[in-house]
UniProtKB/Swiss-Prot annotation:
It is an enzyme of class 5 (isomerase). This is Alpha-methylacyl-CoA racemase. A motif (Microbody targeting signal) lies at residues 379-381. It is found in: Peroxisome; Mitochondrion. The gene is Amacr. GO terms for cellular component: mitochondrion; peroxisome; plasma membrane. GO terms for biological process: bile acid biosynthetic process; fatty acid metabolic process; isoprenoid catabolic process. Residues 316-344 are annotated as: Disordered. The modification N6-succinyllysine is found at K86, K100, K267. The lineage of its organism: Eukaryota, Metazoa, Chordata, Craniata, Vertebrata. Substrate binds at R36, L54, D55, L56, K57, G120, H121, D122, I123, N124, Y125. Pathway: Lipid metabolism; bile acid biosynthesis; Lipid metabolism; fatty acid metabolism. It comes from Mus musculus. It comes from the Eukaryota. Keywords: Acetylation, Isomerase, Mitochondrion, Peroxisome. Monomer.
Amino acid sequence: MVLRGVRVVELAGLAPGPFCGMVLADFGAEVVRVNRLGSTGENFLARGKRSLALDLKRSQGVTVLRRMCARADVLLEPFRCGVMEKLQLGPETLLQDNPKLIYARLSGFGQSGIFSKVAGHDINYLALSGVLSKIGRSGENPYPPLNLLADFGGGGLMCTLGIVLALFERTRSGRGQVIDSSMVEGTAYLSSFLWKTQPMGLWKQPRGQNILDGGAPFYTTYKTADGEFMAVGAIEPQFYALLLKGLGLESEELPSQMSSADWPEMKKKFADVFAKKTKAEWCQIFDGTDACVTPVLTFEEALHHQHNRERASFITDGEQLPSPRPAPLLSRTPAVPSAKRDPSVGEHTVEVLREYGFSQEEILQLHSDRIVESDKLKANL
């Protein structure tokens, strides 16, 4: 795999950091998740990782992490600005120990600025990026599209990109560097198309009344006779013509496709037509055409959809739980996600410490002093 041999130390945090670490692990990196002692939180995104339980509030725990980072390629930390410095684990310290270290800092607001030390969640980062103002139905409040955009798109995935870029640059310079990955800025960067197309008038109407935000009758969803939904994205004229054909409508009897003043009435007409058939019936009509009409699938339906099955787009883990296959698909060095169950907290404490150069005596002492936790050591005491 493409990241085979890359050592990553991931400090436990909420979803964006674990997702970043999971992507790295899926593509071959050796990821150690450092959990807090006594942590009972689920490792929802721990596939392919190993878990070390370590107390970073005590000086011995800080020393352990410094020794690990001296041998690691990447440190991934998800804390607010200043937390790592307070622990004496800031980039100045760790890069002095290991000049080749990639020090990845994933936070909501970044490492500087007036919001850098305050709490926030996906919706807050989405709001500050400007993107939230664009999402929502006409006449309604803005609403977040789950917590995908800022947490995972602008956060975890953008941080993963930063790490891979820094690793590539290190092959030239031999030096590590600090990655300041802000979810606000990552989300804003994802919205570059929106910014660049503003002068074209693509977003001149209020939220929910533009061509790509649900305002157009040919770019929205419609309810079917059985209470399900179909998604329509027939923007181009040739695709729009196929949409009308499938709906049994004549273009001569309708206003011009791009007559935005007529869109509300056209949406009502399209909705009336879609409501006359079930989702399955509409799939029979539109599947295999270029009308850009697809069913809105549930997770369960997505698992079993023929297209997704042909591409093996979903996999099962060691506990037979389904999840998406890692993407993108590389031809020579594809991801090989672990089929094992996700690790329990501290499950690999002993083996990880050994790999990072700790002697048996040191490990026993750390356990005795409650700097680390390990069920394996407990069983032997």
